[in-house]
Amino acid sequence: HAGGKFDGGGYKVSGGLHGVGASVVNALSTELEVFVHREGKIHYQKYERGIPVADLKVIGDTDQTGTITRFKPDPEIFQETTVYDFDTLATRMRELAFLNRNIKLTIEDKRERKQKKEFHYEGGIKSYVEHLNRSKQPIHEEPVYVEGSKDGIQVEVSLQYNEGYTNNIYSFTNNIHTYEGGTHEVGFKTALTRVINDYGRKNSILKDADSNLTGEDVREGLTAIVSIKHPNPQFEGQTKTKLGNSEARTITESVFSEAFEKFLLENPNVARKIVEKGTMAARARVAAKKARELTRRKSALEVSSLPGKLADCSSKDPAISEIYIVEGDSAGGSAKQGRDRHFQAILPLKGKIINVEKARLDKILSNDEVRTIITAIGTNIGGDFDIEKARYHKVIIMTDADVD
């Protein structure tokens, strides 16, 4: 291997699993050059398809330190493309700059388009949360920031609530985005739920008769970054998308809960807003459950429960059936006249129904037009969604291009 992660002194933490990254890049390149600026000298070596062209040699003096690597992907291996996408690389550079406070990263494209970007964030993951929430309405101005370390594991968490109804939690281990979460994310979520419930009880925001808020309740409108640095990460699988270290859960939970408890005590106005947002989410969850049960009872599989507005087709074969959703009864009338009754169904709806992107599930399901769509298509929603129950394999939405 070429990696420096195994000898104990090269890196404090590393994202590598096997220490073969440079070797793999070398093997997959038609040519690779390395310039190492070290101890006043520039050391150079060139490879072609993984084979050294010559021995390592000194080619000059330098007052800098660092490594320059140039490589050209092998088109015989990468047959689909060897062209790099600037925006994809820039997104990753920005992410790394957020995750490593005060580091400056530059990406420059010297091809025809000629573009260059620099990323440098003094706020680190706190700036990352602000970036993610830039188009939202935060309910507290400053993101919460927590950092601490234990047993060589460093934990950083930043979070901010907004007025939205979805949550965005991004977790990282040694700068690697753990898309599927893992023990560090579980530790954070557990601590968040417990601390908010404890604060709500102690300050009588949650009454004795109230049930505890669920994890789903306290995460509504939350944007959070959980980043840990671990000297020996154990990922589940080769893709590094989920962290498996059990101690990461305990340490993340401990570091975050202690600091977050202190934050809530020192910021009672913000704390109340957070708990009250959770209680509103809990009420909406209960209402949505009732609405879902109502929708479920009106099963789309029962012909008797199909919406009165629906002009159904005569075919019972979903594979050939299609439904046209049109605006208003007048459009519905025209569509009915022009359709083939055998396989084309028409569902006229009011023009402007509800913006489901900005509404809670209980509000969405209390809307007659939305319920009509759910019932007509037949797949149900959320955890009960079943594509096999679709009554039509083609859905055509016919609307004009105005605001509604």
Curated annotation (Swiss-Prot):
Main location: cytoplasm
Cofactor(s) annotated in UniProt: Mg(2+); Mn(2+); Ca(2+)
Domain Toprim per the UniProt entry, residue ranges: 321-404
CC terms in the record's Gene Ontology section: cytoplasm
Cofactor, how bound (note): Binds two Mg(2+) per subunit. The magnesium ions form salt bridges with both the protein and the DNA. Can also accept other divalent metal cations, such as Mn(2+) or Ca(2+).
EC number of the protein: 5.6.2.2
Catalysed reactions listed for this entry: ATP-dependent breakage, passage and rejoining of double-stranded DNA
Xref: SUPFAM superfamilies: ATPase domain of HSP90 chaperone/DNA topoisomerase II/histidine kinase, Ribosomal protein S5 domain 2-like, Type II DNA topoisomerase
Binding annotation for Mg(2+) 1: 327, 400
Site (Interaction with DNA): residue numbering on this chain: 352, 355
Role played: A type II topoisomerase that negatively supercoils closed circular double-stranded (ds) DNA in an ATP-dependent manner to modulate DNA topology and maintain chromosomes in an underwound state. Negative supercoiling favors strand separation, and DNA replication, transcription, recombination and repair, all of which involve strand separation. Also able to catalyze the interconversion of other topological isomers of dsDNA rings, including catenanes and knotted rings. Type II topoisomerases break and join 2 DNA strands simultaneously in an ATP-dependent manner.
Family: Belongs to the type II topoisomerase GyrB family.
Protein name: DNA gyrase subunit B
